[in-house]
């Protein structure tokens, strides 16, 4: 059983890595250049992901699904709360500068919740003989429902936790313009090797470009006057005249998930769209085809962005904080949360017995930190370069951590 689970996990994670490697190859070949990567990311957020959410949530949604939606929301709140606690303890141990403490505190709390879980659950179900092929749509529907609460906590908790640091001291982006970049926990005078100012500026500019590239890989960021990529936008999910009335966590994928969940409760509507003989099945089929391509397209952009501007320097964030960022999100949080779900399943009679729900809830706590936390840092002017460097190395370790946790989940949990 363990050997079978390991094979299933290796195949699933390896496919994700190979898709990302394909994106890296296309970038080095000049195909996925900067503008193309931006277009691919926007296509995923504005069209492919909404189509995926609509076509996966609608068949899954029913009155019987509402308790499972509540469990998914509770799971997200648990991951955020426990992640903040882990992040807080890690800052006490590593003692980063005050300007980065809340950034590092948020990194274990907010995980990547769309392209990796969408792709991973479908690959696990396809490889594991214990599941049926039709289970893929149901599991991806659960991932889509999880995104509802994830979007709220990403922008609500993320923006507030990281933004509070601006009250303590000026943003790091302002201080690094006039002094040598500082390694966490070390004075600026010894934080970097002696080199010319021009060399440092080139390195900082490359890492800043890397931060902006990574920040656009996930859910759409809230529209602000100072936010990235808003100057040339003509259309947006958050129209500027109504911006003050729209919460920051409202974006197109989140709105699609909520509206689809509500529409899915309307009796008889599913019969008009989903069955092969339904009169509007051609519309549903086209959206399903577009949505199915979304995770792979998004992962191509991830791979391309990770190699576009070279490797970030580990000294940008510091080795101790980077180690805490990796261990907290990829080892401690999954270990605590998966153990809790297993205990509840054994001792709480009200816990759902759905193995697909358990699979999604466990996978969501094992993913690396959400790329959109970089967007939050950019919007608040603090810690974007440092967080980006940490996420680069965290994602490398996540290849092995995801394989290990997926093996545990398939073998012992579901």
PLM features: residue spans?
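Alpha-helical transmembrane segments of multi-pass small-molecule/ion transporters
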Residues: 1-414
């Amino acid at each position: 059983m363990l050997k079978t689970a390991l094979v299933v996990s290796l195949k699933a994670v390896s496919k994700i890595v190979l898709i990302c490697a394909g994106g890296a190859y296309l970038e080095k070949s000049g195909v996925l250049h900067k503008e193309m990567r931006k277009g691919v990311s926007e296509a995923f957020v504005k069209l492919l992901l909404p189509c995926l959410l609509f076509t996966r949530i609608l068949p899954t949604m029913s009155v019987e699904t509402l308790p499972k939606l509540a469990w998914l929301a509770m799971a997200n709140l648990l991951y955020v709360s426990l992640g903040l606690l882990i992040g807080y303890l890690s800052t006490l141990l590593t003692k980063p500068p005050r300007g980065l403490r809340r950034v590092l505190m948020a990194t274990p709390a907010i995980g990547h919740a769309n392209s990796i879980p969408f792709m991973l659950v479908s690959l696990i179900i396809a490889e594991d003989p214990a599941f049926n092929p039709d289970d893929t749509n149901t599991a991806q529907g659960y991932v889509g429902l999880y995104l509802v609460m994830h979007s709220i906590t990403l922008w609500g908790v993320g923006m507030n936790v990281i933004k509070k640091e601006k009250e303590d001291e000026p943003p790091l982006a302002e201080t690094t313009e006039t002094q040598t970049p500082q390694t966490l926990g070390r004075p600026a005078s010894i934080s970097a090797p002696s080199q010319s100012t021009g060399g440092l500026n080139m390195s900082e500019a490359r890492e800043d470009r890397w931060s902006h590239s990574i920040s656009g890989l996930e859910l759409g960021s809230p529209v602000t006057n100072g936010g990235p990529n808003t100057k040339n936008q003509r259309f947006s999910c958050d129209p500027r005249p109504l911006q003050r009335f729209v919460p920051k966590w409202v974006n197109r994928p989140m709105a699609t998930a909520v509206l689809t969940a509500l529409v899915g409760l309307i009796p008889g509507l599913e019969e008009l769209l989903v069955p092969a003989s339904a009169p509007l099945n051609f519309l549903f089929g086209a959206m399903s085809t577009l949505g199915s391509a979304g995770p792979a397209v998004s992962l191509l952009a991830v791979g391309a962005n990770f190699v576009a501007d070279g490797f970030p320097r580990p000294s940008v964030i510091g080795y101790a904080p980077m180690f805490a960022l990796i261990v907290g999100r990829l080892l401690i949080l999954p270990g605590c949360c998966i153990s809790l779900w297993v205990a509840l399943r054994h001792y709480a009679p009200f816990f759902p017995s759905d193995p697909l729900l358990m699979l999604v809830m466990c996978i969501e706590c094992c993913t690396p930190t959400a790329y959109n936390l970089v967007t939050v840092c950019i919007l608040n002017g603090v810690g974007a370069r440092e967080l980006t460097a940490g996420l680069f190395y965290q994602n490398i370790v996540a290849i092995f951590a995801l394989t290990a946790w997926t093996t545990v989940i398939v073998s012992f949990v579901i």
